């Protein structure tokens, strides 16, 4: 971000185009998935299983499948995580994407497999360069 003013940073965040906002909807992978795929973060998609790591006691450690992703607000709806309205109808409790970890990936899309592979290769190259620079010193 260019400015240090919080108000300007919020303004830029709220007015981001959807293709850039999608990059903000990422979450850490669980330790097992990090070891399996060799990456640390990935964009959340509908169908992923996530675990809530921050929030109220009734939300904390809740695990469920992502039902909906809202790019406008940067929040996700998780299956089974609902509250009741005054008339008794259940509605989803929206959780910010940064407050969850991904425990199981939905790999039904071949494009997502390509994304994971591309990110893994980029991370390996980064680690090699980092290792070479530390050896040179």
Curated annotation (Swiss-Prot):
InterPro entries listed in its UniProt record: Rib_uL2_dom2, Ribosomal_uL24_euk/arc, Ribosomal_uL24_KOW, Translation_prot_SH3-like_sf
Gene3D superfamilies assigned: 2.30.30.30
The entry's keywords: Ribonucleoprotein, Ribosomal protein, RNA-binding, rRNA-binding
GO biological process, one term: translation
Family annotation (CDD domains): KOW_RPL26
Keyword Cytoplasm: no
Protein family membership: Belongs to the universal ribosomal protein uL24 family.
NCBIfam families listed in its UniProt record: rplX_A_E (TIGR01080)
Quaternary structure (record): Part of the 50S ribosomal subunit.
Role played: One of two assembly initiator proteins, it binds directly to the 5'-end of the 23S rRNA, where it nucleates assembly of the 50S subunit. Located at the polypeptide exit tunnel on the outside of the subunit.
Protein name: Large ribosomal subunit protein uL24
Organism from which the protein derives: Sulfurisphaera tokodaii (strain DSM 16993 / JCM 10545 / NBRC 100140 / 7) (Sulfolobus tokodaii)
């Amino acid at each position: 971000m260019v400015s240090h003013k919080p108000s300007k940073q919020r303004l830029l965040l709220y007015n981001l185009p959807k293709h850039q906002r999608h990059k903000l909807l990422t979450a850490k992978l669980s330790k097992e998935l990090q070891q399996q795929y060799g990456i640390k973060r990935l964009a959340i998609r509908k169908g992923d299983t996530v675990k809530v790591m921050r929030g109220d006691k009734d939300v904390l450690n809740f695990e469920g499948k992502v039902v909906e992703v809202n790019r406008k607000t940067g929040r996700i709806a998780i299956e089974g995580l609902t509250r009741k309205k005054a008339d008794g109808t259940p509605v989803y409790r929206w959780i910010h994407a940064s407050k969850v970890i991904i425990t199981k990936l939905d790999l039904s899309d071949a494009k997502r497999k390509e994304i994971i592979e591309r990110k893994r290769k980029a991370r390996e190259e980064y680690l090699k360069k980092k290792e070479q620079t530390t050896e040179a010193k």
